[in-house]
Design a protein with these regions (language model features):
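Helix-to-loop junction immediately C-terminal to a conserved catalytic motif
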Residues: 75
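Conserved ABC ATPase "signature" region
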Residues: 28-31, 92, 112, 124-141
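The feature captures the beta-strand-to-loop junction immediately N-terminal to the Walker
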Residues: 60-62
Length: 183
């Protein structure tokens, strides 16, 4: 990587605050504008970095440290409470096992749906489908409902999809899941 390589992620002062209520009644009062007794819990506070093309970033920490929260913010599946996040180019993610796959649809149908979700035209997905299926090593199982798949099969299909679309940023939460399920 050279210093001139463009940034694919820019994060400045990023934070995520959750509002915690002691009871459902307190939450309802807040929604109705009657009283707000919520406590604030900052899962992340003042996170800043840049990631450039060709770089890798590992996020490690104790349980509850905010690792998954950060990755969800970067992927765009969660909104920040504070700060700025700029994504340049396509960002794809594997955040939870099978997230985004409909269990009653076949693997092939899920590929088409997921492709449209990440902004690929149907023709592009049709062109990529065979190579994704081959890389996933699912064979004929790709035409069965995803609910019949083992967790390893789901992970292989998701990984084959997100790598085939050649994203500028690939986000994977709990990478050990991918390696233990596929080896």
């Amino acid at each position: 990587m050279q210093a001139a390589d463009p940034a694919v992620l820019q994060v400045r002062g990023l934070g995520k605050c959750y509002r915690l209520y002691a009871t459902p009644g307190e939450r309802l009062q807040a929604l109705l504008g009657l009283a707000d007794k919520a406590k604030q819990h900052w899962a992340l506070k003042d996170i800043s970095f840049e990631l450039h093309r060709g770089q890798c970033l590992g996020v490690i920490g104790d349980n509850g440290a905010g690792k998954s929260t950060l990755l969800k913010l970067l992927a765009g599946t969660l909104h920040a409470s504070h700060g700025q996040l700029h994504r340049m180019g396509r960002v794809t993610a594997i955040l939870e096992l099978g997230a985004g796959f409909h269990p009653d649809f076949t693997g092939r149908d899920n590929l088409m749906f997921a492709g449209s979700f990440i902004g690929l035209a149907r023709d592009d997905m049709l062109r990529l489908a065979d190579s994704i299926i081959e890389f996933s090593e699912l064979g004929d199982a790709v035409d069965r409902p995803v609910k019949t798949y083992s967790s390893g099969m789901v992970v292989r299909l998701a990984f084959a999809l997100v790598t085939a679309v050649q994203p500028e940023v690939l986000i994977i939460d709990s990478i050990q899941t991918i390696w233990t399920e596929t080896l």
